[in-house]
Regions:
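A bilobed periplasmic-binding-protein/Venus flytrap-type ligand-binding module shared by bacterial periplasmic
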Residues: 1, 93-106
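Short amphipathic alpha-helical coupling segments at ligand-binding clamshell hinges
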Residues: 104-115
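Extracellular/periplasmic juxtamembrane helices and adjacent flexible linkers that interface
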Residues: 113-149
Length: 149
């Protein structure tokens, strides 16, 4: 079975071990308990793995799947597949431009709308990886992004 969604993951949860930050595992309202209430079956096992240790945990086979922020550079570095949250358990990372009314000219609003439409979670993750993993200057990354608009 190819895993594409959280629903797919829930269907095999009883057979796999989930790695996640200890705080997520213990969070009753937005962590493991809430996920199980929302999507279904319990996992065969869980193991606490903090974000900075996911790469090592993958190499060691500590768990079968991991809870990771979609913008974490480990996603690109380890070539992780992000599953679709098909029931919207967790809102996506979103960039929103806020303007005060006096400066919100139609041209500025249109420009910010174009930027916002291009700043997808995947694109943000790529830019963060370029900065964090490759050491590229954030200004260089930002300018390269703006050049694509």
């Amino acid at each position: 079975m190819q895993l594409l969604t959280y629903t797919n993951l829930a269907s095999i949860a009883p057979d796999i071990t989930l790695g996640a930050p200890a705080s997520w595992l213990a969070n009753d309202t937005a962590g493991l308990a809430a996920f199980v209430d929302y999507y279904g079956p319990e996992f065969d096992g869980t193991v606490a793995v903090e974000s900075d240790a996911i790469g090592d945990a993958i190499d060691q086979g500590t768990a079968d799947c991991f809870v990771v922020d979609s913008l974490d550079p480990v996603v690109a570095r380890e070539r992780l597949t992000l599953l679709l949250d098909d029931k919207v358990f967790v809102p996506s990372n979103t960039v929103i431009a806020l303007l005060s009314e006096p400066v919100a000219t139609p041209d500025l609003v249109a420009t910010l709308d174009a930027i916002g439409a291009s700043l997808t979670t995947q694109r943000l993750a790529q830019m963060l990886n370029e900065i964090n993993a490759n050491g590229t200057d954030p200004i260089v990354v930002a300018n390269a992004f703006l050049d694509t608009l």
